[in-house]
Design a protein with these regions (language model features):
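N-terminal helical cap/lid subdomain that shapes the substrate entry/recognition surface
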Residues: 2-11, 15-94, 98-103, 116
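Substrate-recognition "cap/lid" segment bordering the active-site pocket of phosphatases
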Residues: 108, 114-146
Length: 146
């Protein structure tokens, strides 16, 4: 039997129970700018790159007016504002990760999300000492499922 050397935790919806906050951030952004989402932001978009989600849920006119990069970055800022007061690891994960670390098992975050969100989660959940490595969507050429 081979020894487990490491655990990689997906961040959004696994390491932290934050998915409703992403949906709320899209809704809040639309409210602030006075437009409607083309379709609801639901599970089908989880794991997508932020720019791809913007293109999927907003009309092309909105994307052209504001710019996809601006909209994506702004949405992530709103998400962090909304989630900060409630940010915490999924119940039971902190002791599991602490046990893994005590056994010499490395732990990492792997996320399609932007680096700013990964850093935010590590800071807001006080989990820097738990993670040996963090990988974000900024660190890879192609996001999931590649």
């Amino acid at each position: 039997m081979s020894k487990i050397k490491g655990l990689i935790f997906d961040m959004d919806g696994t390491l932290v129970p934050n998915m409703p906050y992403h949906s709320r951030a899209f809704e809040e952004q639309a409210r602030r700018h006075g437009y409607k989402l083309r379709r609801p932001v639901d599970g089908r978009f989880f794991g997508w790159h932020k720019d791809d989600v913007i293109r999927a849920v907003l009309d092309s006119e909105i994307c052209e007016k504001y710019g996809v990069e601006f909209l994506a970055d702004e949405k992530e800022e709103i998400y962090r504002e909304l989630y900060r007061p409630d940010a915490d690891l999924t119940p039971g994960l902190r002791p599991l990760i602490q046990e893994a670390k005590s056994l010499g098992i490395g732990c990492a975050i792997g996320s399609a999300g932007p680096r700013e969100n990964v850093e935010f989660i590590v800071e807001a959940t006080n989990s820097a000492e738990l993670m040996d490595v963090t990988i974000s969507g900024n660190d890879v050429q192609h996001c999931k499922p590649n």
